[in-house]
Amino acid sequence: FEKYGHTLEGAAAALFEFNKGLIDALHTIVPAVKPQCAYYEMYGWQGMKALHDTIAYAKEKGMFVVTDGKRNDIGTTMEAYAVAHLGQVDVQGEKIAPFAGDSLTVNGYLGSDGILSLLDICDKQDKGIFVLVKTSNPSSGELQDLKLDSNESIYETMGHMCEAWGAEHMGKYGYSAVGAVVGATYPEQLKELREKLPHTFFLVPGYGAQGGGA
């Protein structure tokens, strides 16, 4: 703030300096970071530059970056999100990676129209996605726990869809590019889904303040 004053530039610079300190302290013992886009977007383009710089710094230190954007759309709009966060944009023949995260959280509840265009870019760039399946928030069951005619819950069905989407995008260690977000606040559902989705990486939010634990 001494350099920029009480401005968006100052706030964004403070964010990045704070993040650098965390990354410097943790990169030898923690393999990944998950910056939440909303906390950068609230500081405008200056905040988004701090997000870009944070991702670049984390990757420079050898960390895997999951960009927590929970993007949700269809077709070319979803493809644009994928290009922004995972791919490269064409600027007059020059290929430039705007943010260059390794993975992106997405909402799959628009169905295949919102996922398949992402996977083309994941294949080209060796990236991945994490799809919301059973989320950690208290009201998640209002929708996700509802039973369908198949007698499966909505979250179980979404989990199976993740396995199906990922079947043609398998890595050499037997896991697909399509991961699942499953909250630590629901340990029984977490255990159930882990057994049903053997080829799916799990992103498990909800530790600490939300009440989840190991």
What do the PLM-derived regions correspond to, one by one?
Residues 18, 22, 50-54, 81, ...:
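A general structural detector for well-ordered alpha-helical segments in enzyme core domains, enriched
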Residues 38-40, 70-74, 107-109, 134-138, ...:
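Active-site beta-loop-alpha junctions enriched in small/polar residues
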Residues 1-25:
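N-terminal glycine-rich anion-binding loop in soluble enzyme alpha/beta folds
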Residues 33-35, 65-67, 102-106, 129-133, ...:
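Hydrophobic faces of well-ordered beta-strands that scaffold small-molecule active sites
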Residues 23-29, 55-60, 119-124, 194-197:
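Acidic (Asp/Glu)-rich catalytic clusters
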Residues 73-179:
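Conserved anion-binding
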Residues 29-31, 35-97, 189:
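N-terminal active-site wall of soluble small-molecule enzyme domains
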Residues 184-214:
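A C-terminal functional module that forms or caps the active site or interfaces directly
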